Amino acid sequence: MSYNYVVTAQKPTAVNGCVTGHFTSAEDLNLLIAKNTRLEIYVVTAEGLRPVKEVGMYGKTAVMELFRPKGESKDLLFILTAKYNACILEYKQNGDNIDIITRAHGNVQDRIGRPSETGIIGIIDPECRMIGLRLYDGLFKVIPLDRENKELKAFNIRLEELQVIDVKFLYGCQAPTICFVYQDPQGRHVKTYEVSLREKEFNKGPWKQENVEAEASMVIAVPEPFGGAIIIGQESITYHNGDKYLAIAPPIIKQSTIVCHNRVDPNGSRYLLGDMEGRLFMLLLEKEEQMDGTVTLKDLRVELLGETSIAECLTYLDNGVVFVGSRLGDSQLVKLNVDSNEQGSYVVAMETFTNLGPIVDMCVVDLERQGQGQLVTCSGAFKEGSLRIIRNGIGIHEHASIDLPGIKGLWPLRSDSHREMDNMLVLSFVGQTRVLMLNGEEVEETELTGFVDDQQTFFCGNVAHQQLIQITSASVRLVSQEPKALVSEWKEPNGKNISVASCNSNQVVVAVGRALYYLEIRPQELRQINCTEMEHEVACLDITPLGDTNGMSPLCAIGLWTDISARILKLPSFELLHKEMLGGEIIPRSILMTTFESSHYLLCALGDGALFYFGLSLETGLLSDRKKVTLGTQPTVLRTFRSLSTTNVFACSDRPTVIYSSNHKLVFSNVNLKEVNYMCPLNSDGYPDSLALANNSTLTIGTIDEIQKLHIRTVPLYESPRKICYQEVSQCFGVLSSRIEVQDASGGTTALRPSASTQALSSSVSTSKLFSSSTAPHETSFGEEVEVHNLLIIDQHTFEVLHAHQFLQNEYALSLVSCKLGKDPNTYFIVGTAMVYPEEAEPKQGRIVVFHYSDGKLQSLAEKEVKGAVYSMVEFNGKLLASINSTVRLYEWTAEKELRTECNHYNNIMALYLKTKGDFILVGDLMRSVLLLAYKPMEGNFEEIARDFNPNWMSAVEILDDDNFLGAENAFNLFVCQKDSAATTDEERQHLQEVGLSHLGEFVNVFCHGSLVMQNLGETSTPTQGSVLFGTVNGMIGLVTSLSESWYNLLLDMQNRLNKVIKSVGKIEHSFWRSFHTERKTEPATGFIDGDLIESFLDISRPKMQEVVANLQIDDGSGMKREATVDDLIKIVEELTRIH
């Protein structure tokens, strides 16, 4: 068996459907967006879209339509999933609770039937008498809409027109009437039928039209007064209603194909049309009033409004605002203006919604060397193509920033005794101190009576008895708040300079070299209580009061130079309670006592970014449980701040980190800032609950996220990225991309728009000795689109395109790797290509090209001709492994810098994917699942170890460990195969057993090892091993990790219990949704835990949690079982959420 846990790190972002209507109430205008398995419900307000609820469906949304049957006060929602689960949903609000009620449900799958090539079509009769579905060729399925019916029952009507392209119900018909475009050997035609519910048959329709445009693809039913239907083709738009026929062929729509439409006015006089290039059109129906008062159609007109994201769906909201849902790029809210701008566009983007889909390729890199992966994806396509940099962390939202270099410390201050909020910020510099006054959001420099400004401040703050304190290198100064005046000053008896200081509201400890002085703060007096001498100089100290000690700390923590130790001293006596040798050469730079979740800790940060932390006993001063983590590479400064009424520690360094506690374990979270030298909390009128942060050049004031989440940065390419790899030595990414060019009259081609490959800092073009120009058998014609492929070299810091290398005409770049080969010290970018001609079934020629990038120049060092397409390449033990059509081939890199074939393996249909580990090679085939090869270095050949004999059409593969192999296939399933080394017969050993099966509901394009969270920081008890990330067509990022058998069994038990407690939307069984399902077979899921379901435990109410836990047995750690509590499960699930 194989035990795995699959969970979503980023929910799908590609929009595949949107509708508008009155779903939450009769008054609300709602926008409903389908993102594969997620349904998002918004209310349209004057300020924009307000999210109301997000629903996870147990299915891929194939049809989503709002309708209002007679007697209903608001709209109901009909949904059909890809596995044919149909349901009617209603929105119910009880106080703060929002429920999506399933009014009716059922599965409408047929046992036999060929799913139509044009996909699932679902339509609702305008009078709400029935729902029509076109699922299979030659059948039209009808679901009658009776109010009482809880179960959706359907019947089929035979359709002799097998190839239906699109179908709609017409308006204003006595009986429900469908109008459809279909194809037969003669061409495409339009036909109508009446649907008889009683006879369960079609009756002859009111009209038909034979031989419409050969590319006619969409039917739009027009409401009354016009009635009838509009048929949209590639070149023409026609209107039919039986009596009237009107056709127009506007040249502007020919350039591309119209893919979506939406009605603007209820009477159907205007329609929005969107095409594949992202252009938005308005179709206008001009009316003519007849003598008898009826209205007929006079003319059709199409106007180009402007450009949007490439639309998958459009919906008109209100007041000229349109939602553009996109699958290939970011979705948008756009405003349609009455007047055009300088570019002639009527469209203005108001808001953009990030979409990572389709993720075509991705790589995990640790760009900032901080032990945390960032994911860089090739996202989007055509003009929406981009790179997305995704990292997990805590965001800081900047509210103000001031250029102020050289800050050495900062503190908030309340200058008057009656103030609740901070109104000043004290900044320390070498040799001087400045005070900033905060007035609302305004910041101006000011002076404070009693403060000195010509010395560096070590500490400043509000202290007991309505006083302020300033500790500088020369003295400790106590200043009264009313009136502001110096009331007491303490200097070192011999006039030496203070080197380190710490202060709380009642106590001060300062260090002068090796001497320590302890002072107490009284009204208008600083009283020296004690002093002592340490054996080495003091590097850092802290007297933060912990527990309920009335603001007095009984302990003082210090870090010393020379012997590199941390010590706990008792106050006021300076008695040594504990001495901890930290080891190494690097001195402690910052020390802090703090309390997390009522446990006390000592944190001590060194000058190289290392952090030690210990449990601390307040009574004895003893340290326990020593642990160490690395937070950065530079000296770290520790400061506490409060957020959500819990204490957190901010570690300032080149890798700023927030430290907090969860389930009594310390958690370290990245902050999404480059570097922070100093910080302090700030709570002023203009900047409530904020942080002030200083780096080398700037002071920033901002608020901090309460939780860790994925942050996404976009680098637009305006063309399609295909493959990405990272090259550390040159600090660059290599990206394969393609742009579309159009053949012009002179025989050359021109780019449609500026994009990454045409705007690079430098560029080069392939010339090849391998292929003479006469090899191109294919002549392109005027106006034809051609793909131009490039290798882009992109800087890892600025993401600037440093170089673009263009491949040959008709040459498609398919695979990319950055690696060293043999004993050659250079690192190369290697690209695999194919010569693609329309008349060839599969490519017969291709190249492997070896590039070297250094000093801003890209050189092509070697090229190797191959007889086919180079689908995949990986570095393999210092050699190059490539899959070419059906062959897996290993190349050596010779001293002459040439690729020489070492061995081949031929037993595949089409070897698309390669992954390696040690001497093992996993091959993913187009249709023959996966195969495991071993390379025999002594014999210099491949041996076929085992294969999966199930026919799976693969979309991506990955090696989990030595024995387990992960695959994704084209029916949206995941499976794990296992090598059976213990099998007794050879035949059994040659079979890879399918030990894990699950339906993901997403098309996976890429797997890669890596993680989005800080690795091995702090303590973890997550029971998971390894981490494989995957990216999908819908922009979802997921994670697969392995479990032990005992954890799998516990989580499986929990999963089954959750399924009884959590009611699914649409009453779809979880077991049905996750069952492995292809055209050949359906099998129950096994070997996979649904992490999304497990994590939903944290969102249910306490009584429901109690239901899940009832009689659940867990291990008590000593091998005995005990009954689990709700808190046990919360802890376990919270641990699991932390892996992504």
Curated annotation (Swiss-Prot):
GO CC term, one of those recorded: Cul4A-RING E3 ubiquitin ligase complex
- Which parts of the sequence are annotated with region: WD repeat beta-propeller A? 13-356
One annotated GO molecular function: DNA binding
Entry's PANTHER family? DNA REPAIR/RNA PROCESSING CPSF FAMILY (PTHR10644)
Q: What does this protein do?
A: Protein, which is both involved in DNA repair and protein ubiquitination, as part of the UV-DDB complex and DCX (DDB1-CUL4-X-box) complexes, respectively. Core component of the UV-DDB complex (UV-damaged DNA-binding protein complex), a complex that recognizes UV-induced DNA damage and recruit proteins of the nucleotide excision repair pathway (the NER pathway) to initiate DNA repair. The UV-DDB complex may recognize UV-induced DNA damage and recruit proteins of the nucleotide excision repair pathway (the NER pathway) to initiate DNA repair.
Q: What is known of its domains?
A: The core of the protein consists of three WD40 beta-propeller domains.
Protein known as:
DNA damage-binding protein 1
List the top taxonomic levels of the source: Eukaryota, Metazoa, Chordata, Craniata, Vertebrata
